[in-house]
C-alpha cells in the first residue's frame, strides 16, 4: 500500500465514560487514536491534547452531532430560518476550533437532522438552503487548516444526503477546497447499489477523506458480511489520505444503549479488539500482495 491506514475509534460508543478512561482503554486495545464527539463545550482542548498525546495517541477528527443533546439545539444548516442556519454555522465553527485545538484533521458535518428522514420544506429547498452556511463554515475551516467532511447517512435516518455521490454533488455546489466527503460503511451498504468499493473508487482520493467503520450488522468489522478486503483495497487504489474511525456496537445494541451506558465495557472492548485486529491483518495481507 502507499501507506498504512491508521485506525481510530469514535468516543460516542463509550457513552458517558470519562475521556481519560476512554483513552486508557483505546490505547490498551491498540488504536492509533480517537475521534471526538462534537460537543465543544465539554472539552478543554489543551487538556484533551495532553491526555491523548501522553497515551501515544492522536485525535483524528471531530464528529459533528446534528442535532445536539438539548431540546431545540438543532444545529441545522438546512433550516428555512436564517437564524437557525446561523446557529448551525456557529456550531460547526466551534467544532473547527476544537479540531484545531486538539490537532485533529477534519470535522464531520451532516446538513440535516439525524434520526429525522423527513425534509423541512422539500429536499431541493433544504439542499439549496444549506449551500451558503456550508460555504461559510468551509471558509472558516480553511482559515484553521481543517477539512469539513460531509457524511451521507441512509435514507431511513435523514432526508437529504444518502450516498457518497449525493455528498460530492453537494460539495461541488459549495465549491470550497476545505469541503470534502466521507463514508460510513454501515450506511454505505444500504445506499451504494453497486457496492462500497466501487463508491470509494468513484469518489477518488480528492473527495473521499474519512471513513466510519462498522459491519453490516453494526458490529465490529469482521463480525458480519461486508467485504473488508475489497473495501481496504479500494482505499489503497485511491491512495486514501484519511483514517478509519470505528464505531461498532455489540449485536442487538443501539446508539441509545451506548448513550445510556448499557453496553458492558468488557464486551465492547473485546469486540473493538476483534475489529481492529481484523482490519490490520487484512491491510497487511493487501500490502503483501501489492508490494
Residue ranges and their predicted role:
Residues 40-60, 89-103, 131-139, 196-202, ...:
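Short amphipathic alpha-helices and their capping/turn segments at secondary-structure boundaries
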Residues 78-180, 190, 266-271, 289-290:
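Active-site acidic/histidine proton-transfer and metal-coordination neighborhood
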Residues 35, 61-63, 108, 149, ...:
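Conserved beta-strand positions in the central sheet of alpha/beta enzyme cores
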Residues 1-7, 15-27, 103, 161-183, ...:
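Histidine-acidic metal/acid-base catalytic patches
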Residues 13-15, 19, 40, 65-68, ...:
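Active-site-proximal loop/turn and secondary-structure-junction residues that shape catalytic pockets
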Residues 1-11, 65-79, 111-118:
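N-terminal small/glycine-rich loop or linker at the start of catalytic domains
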Residues 22-42:
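Basic, amphipathic N-terminal segments that precede the first structured/catalytic domain
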Residues 35-55, 111-122:
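Glycine-rich, proline-tolerant flexible connector loops at the mouths of alpha/beta enzymes
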Amino acid at each position: 500500500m502507499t501507506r498504512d491506514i491508521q485506525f481510530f475509534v469514535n468516543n460516542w460508543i463509550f457513552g458517558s465514560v470519562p475521556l481519560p478512561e476512554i483513552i486508557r482503554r483505546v490505547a490498551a486495545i491498540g488504536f492509533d487514536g480517537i475521534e471526538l464527539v462534537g460537543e465543544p463545550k465539554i472539552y478543554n482542548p489543551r487538556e484533551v491534547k495532553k491526555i491523548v498525546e501522553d497515551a501515544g495517541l492522536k485525535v483524528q477528527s471531530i464528529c459533528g452531532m446534528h442535532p445536539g443533546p438539548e431540546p431545540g439545539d438543532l444545529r441545522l444548516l438546512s433550516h428555512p430560518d436564517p437564524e437557525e442556519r446561523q446557529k448551525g454555522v456557529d456550531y460547526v465553527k466551534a467544532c473547527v476550533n476544537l479540531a484545531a485545538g486538539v490537532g485533529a484533521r477534519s470535522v464531520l458535518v451532516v446538513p440535516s437532522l439525524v434520526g429525522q428522514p423527513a425534509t423541512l420544506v422539500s429536499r431541493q429547498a433544504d439542499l439549496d438552503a444549506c449551500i451558503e452556511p456550508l460555504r461559510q463554515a468551509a471558509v472558516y475551516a480553511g482559515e484553521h487548516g481543517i477539512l469539513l467532511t460531509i457524511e451521507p447517512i441512509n435514507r431511513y435516518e435523514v432526508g437529504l444526503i444518502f450516498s457518497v455521490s449525493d455528498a460530492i454533488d453537494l460539495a461541488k455546489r459549495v465549491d470550497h477546497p476545505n469541503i470534502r466527503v466521507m463514508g460510513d460503511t454501515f450506511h454505505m451498504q444500504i445506499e451504494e447499489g453497486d457496492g462500497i468499493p466501487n463508491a470509494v473508487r468513484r469518489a477518488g482520493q480528492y473527495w473521499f477523506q474519512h471513513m466510519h467503520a462498522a459491519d453490516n450488522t453494526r458490529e465490529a468489522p469482521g463480525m458480519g458480511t461486508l467485504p473488508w478486503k475489497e473495501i481496504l483495497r479500494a482505499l489503497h487504489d485511491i491512495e486514501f489520505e484519511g483514517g478509519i474511525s470505528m464505531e461498532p456496537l455489540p449485536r442487538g445494541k443501539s446508539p441509545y444503549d451506548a448513550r445510556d451506558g448499557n453496553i458492558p465495557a468488557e464486551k465492547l472492548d473485546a469486540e473493538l479488539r476483534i475489529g481492529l485486529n481484523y482490519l490490520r491483518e487484512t491491510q497487511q495481507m493487501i500490502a503483501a500482495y501489492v508490494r
